[in-house]
Amino acid sequence: MAAGNTYSEEVLKATNWLQDNAQKEAFSYVFKTQKVNLNGKEIAWNNYNKDTTDAEMINLQRGAETSWDQATDMEWESEIDSLTKGQVLIFDSLVKKCLFEGILQKNLSPSDCYWFIQHEHGQDTGYHCHVLLGGKGLQQAMGKWFRKQLNNLWSRWLIMQCKVPLTPVERIKLRELAEDGEWVSLLTYTHKQTKKQYTKMTHFGNMIAYYFLNKKRKTTEREHGYYLSSDSGFMTNFLKEGERHLVSHLFTEANKPETVETTVTTAQEAKRGKIQTKKEVSIKCTIRDLVNKRCTSIEDWMMTDPDSYIEMMAQTGGENLIKNTLEITTLTLARTKTAYDLILEKAKPSMLPTFNISNTRTCKIFSMHNWNYIKCCHAITCVLNRQGGKRNTILFHGPASTGKSIIAQHIANLVGNVGCYNAANVNFPFNDCTNKNLIWIEEAGNFSNQVNQFKAICSGQTIRIDQKGKGSKQIEPTPVIMTTNEDITKVRIGCEERPEHTQPIRDRMLNINLTRKLPGDFGLLEETEWPLICAWLVKKGYQATMASYMHHWGNVPDWSEKWEEPKMQTPINTPTDSQISTSVKTSPADNNYAATPIQEDLDLALALEPWSEPTTPTFTTALTQHARFSNTDTSPTWSEIETDIRACFGENCAPTTNLE
């Protein structure tokens, strides 16, 4: 450098080291803690300061303390208390311990790796530690593996350093919270097509110079900034705050690209050639706010942002302006988000560590049928994420009061941007289904002449439909959710039944046949239920893609899918988890109706039409049957009922009549 004589040797060495490592790729991890309450015991970030006798840990803490003292600017008196300083030194030793153990587990040499560590305290995040890790043999595909190993090591060392007295069960629970809550996170990005999370590699030197070295040092309890930093080359360990900023400035100047003043005018800009009016700016801001707030109807707009609604209503042609604004909003949501995305974004991360999927009402409904409720929920999320292929419709069918509508209504309310099929409008039944994230068909019946249009929409095809008083409009692939008490696979046009439509309709349906009647006090689904179910599935590796579904369950679901296979596995050695109930038994006396054969005893025709009633007469009351079967766990079969009926008309039980 030309001006090298004006800078210290440490500054020049650090700058040259960053230049040499500017384009090297590295993983970006964040180590953190969360405030936990276990049986009334508060555990905060500064409670992991238990004294240690480990010689290696003590040496690491001494080295960190030396770096802290050397990097302190003596012109400014630090107000950081000794307890906070000691806690940061302990965390520094723990992070390095985790880092080196993770490297050795991969059979890598620490000398072949380069790393950078910086401890910080943020306004919203509190204490956290940034770690950049790269080296020979470290590839992008290994990022998630390292995150999992570092997370396990971090939780183990935190338990050992926790000064709050905990019972063995509480220690296990704290470690579960640390591992399930991902107290070590990895920088990732979402692929536009697959919607999967992939590891995001960073440029090692650029990241340090442009981001970490520009931060202010935390010197008071009220300020936010960095505490301490270190690296594999010992180049930034002892730099004071001013020297760090100088290194960042020199690095930026050395890598500044040559600028050439250019002016490019596009055809649209030349044609417009004017400044946007205040009205245009206001409309654009309103559309952006409506999209961010997920407002898709006039009522939602009135409730969430009444000021902008009144402002548009007061303008000339206000009704048309409001209508067009909402149309742009719904179009934006329909093209940029899926129904699954709109549900998942409502999940609260703070509730996920304590969430138990088996306690949700949806899974209880599936458990009544002895189904694998994880498999059912996974299949539903795939369809909502437009990953079901031709099977683009979720069909809840069965008798009344079995939970069909409460699940469908809950999902539709969470999505918000929903179109409804109107069977009463014979000519334009799908008039309300354009620019939507989900189509809801409640109590579907015979589709008659609309069956071909219905099949096209249910298979996720892009078709054009006619609208009343308008021209035709295109419907993009949109998932459909449907509830019915009838057999929609039987299509009747006039008085003629058309069996050729039965199999094509089945090929388009995710068949969920609910047959168990719910008790009267079952209640509705909680608002947070399905968002947490989706988040739980993602955390456990059940991505909302058909590739993930086939990986876990073997094949794509079809009309005769056996939801009870594979059977649910009860977790063991988990003292904090509640037992998962996979079945709900009810007796005829509980619901006050005459006992009828259970679904498993019906023949194939009744199995396909579970809402049809058997024609066999019933000769005993509910209370009598309940008393008879109180000592058994299974319901009577057809053969048992037939035996009872014959016994009632036998010689011993024949009724006597008086002819007089």
Swiss-Prot record:
SUPFAM superfamilies: Origin of replication-binding domain, RBD-like, P-loop containing nucleoside triphosphate hydrolases. GO terms for molecular function: ATP binding; ATP hydrolysis activity; DNA binding; endonuclease activity; helicase activity; metal ion binding. Keywords: ATP-binding, Covalent protein-DNA linkage, DNA replication, DNA-binding, Endonuclease, G1/S host cell cycle checkpoint dysregulation by virus, Helicase, Host G2/M cell cycle arrest by virus, Host nucleus, Host-virus interaction, Hydrolase, Magnesium, Metal-binding, Modulation of host cell apoptosis by virus, Modulation of host cell cycle by virus, Nuclease, Nucleotide-binding, Transcription, Transcription regulation, Viral DNA replication, Viral genome packaging, Viral release from host cell. A divalent metal cation binds at E120, H128, H130. InterPro entries: Helicase_SF3_DNA-vir (IPR014015), P-loop_NTPase (IPR027417), Parvovirus_NS1_C (IPR021972), Parvovirus_NS1_helicase (IPR001257), Parvovirus_NS1_N (IPR021076), PV_NS1-NUC (IPR049901). Its main location: host cell. Phosphorylated. Residues 22-262 form the PV NS1-Nuc domain. Residues 2-275 are annotated as: DNA-binding. One of its GO terms (cellular component) is host cell nucleus. The active site is at Y211 (for nuclease activity). It holds the Pfam family Parvo_NS1. ATP binds at G398, P399, A400, S401, T402, G403, K404, S405. Its EC number is 3.1.21.-, 3.6.4.12. Belongs to the parvoviruses initiator protein NS1 family. Multifunctional protein which displays endonuclease and helicase activities required for initiating and directing viral DNA replication. Also plays a role in viral packaging and transactivation of several promoters. Binds site-specifically to 2-3 approximate tandem copies within the origins of replication (Ori), unwinds this hairpin region and nicks one DNA strand thereby initiating the rolling circle replication (RCR). Cooperatively binds Ori with host PIF and probably other host factors, which activate the nickase function of NS1. Homooligomer; when bound to DNA. This is Initiator protein NS1. It comes from Porcine parvovirus (strain NADL-2) (PPV). The lineage of its organism: Viruses, Monodnaviria, Shotokuvirae, Cossaviricota, Quintoviricetes.
